[in-house]
Amino acid sequence: MLRIGLTGGIGSGKTRVADKLGEWGAAVIDTDAIAHALTQADGLAMPAIIQAFGPEAVRADGAMDRAWVRNRVFREPQARACLEAILHPLIGQETQAAAERAVGSYLVFVVPLLVESGRWRGQLDRICVVDCDPETQIKRVQNRSGLTESDIRRIMDAQAARATRLKAADDVIVNDGSTTAEVLLARARSLHQSYLALADKHDRHGSTEAGPP
């Protein structure tokens, strides 16, 4: 099956694009959603997170306190490394299992830190970046969350630079502040049609056996 990596900075609109591709028949695996599931109450990652970070890292409902952990990992590089060491192997296992079950015209992995990880390129046929300017990212995230501008900028600073993402891209969907919902839909549909053609060619000529990292 043709494998597409879909990425973009926070607030870029990659989830909206992924949702549309899924509606049109692609199999979509969202690694951020997997990470959320792992850190919910009784999630597979929670015992190790509690052991590493203590009870302060857990909300009253038993899920990981994302705000507390986010502040901790921004302050302490070793805390970030510890969290990644807990989550990344579990995310990889769950992603692999989901890919093996996937049914669709082609497979889309939604990976927020795809470019940063450096491990995905060899497992993908193409990388698609949903791109927008930083100010638009900030406005969108402020509108949907309680994060302050400084918090958002810290998250953005921890992600790959815009130019770095664009350099890694095989395909780009522009979703800046002037992009209407109709225009974004048209751009996503055009890309979907090109992926269908590539998927047909890919399936006729065989596919790789490797799974995601």
Swiss-Prot record:
BP terms from Gene Ontology: coenzyme A biosynthetic process
Coiled-coil intervals: none
Known catalytic reactions: 3'-dephospho-CoA + ATP = ADP + CoA + H(+)
Root EC class: transferase
GO terms under cellular component: cytoplasm
Keywords recorded for this protein, A-Z: ATP-binding, Coenzyme A biosynthesis, Cytoplasm, Kinase, Nucleotide-binding, Transferase
Compartmental location: Cytoplasm
Family recorded in the similarity comment: Belongs to the CoaE family.
PANTHER family xref list: BIFUNCTIONAL COENZYME A SYNTHASE-RELATED, DEPHOSPHO-COA KINASE-RELATED
Function recorded in the entry: Catalyzes the phosphorylation of the 3'-hydroxyl group of dephosphocoenzyme A to form coenzyme A.
Name listed for the protein in its UniProt record: Dephospho-CoA kinase
Taxonomic lineage from the root: Bacteria, Pseudomonadati, Pseudomonadota, Betaproteobacteria, Burkholderiales
